[in-house]
Amino acid sequence: RTKPELRNQERYNAAKLTEAGVPVAFNTDALVFPIDLLAASAKIAVLAGLPWQQALESLTIRSAEAAGVADEIGSVTVGKRADLLVFSRDPIDLLVKPDAVFVDGICLN
């Protein structure tokens, strides 16, 4: 079962849009598509041709831009909130968990 707006979704869309110069952001409506699976969208796009760096940007700065909050979050920049996940492995690996979680610069683990 899937949502009607996903009917024409194709795994190559992110790569095609990026090649055409269109910024791509990954998102989820967490009650329907669990946020834990957000990296899966990026991983599928990479396997379908989206460059890894573009996938990471789509999960971070492009999503912040789409939400209108890129001045606060989405990149490691002086003056922005220090909400960070630290990984020792590929962050879009489907099974990887963060080594550290920071919210407003405070390590939560």
Q: Each predicted region: which residue ranges?
A:
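C-terminal cap of metal-dependent C-N hydrolases
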Residues: 65, 77-109
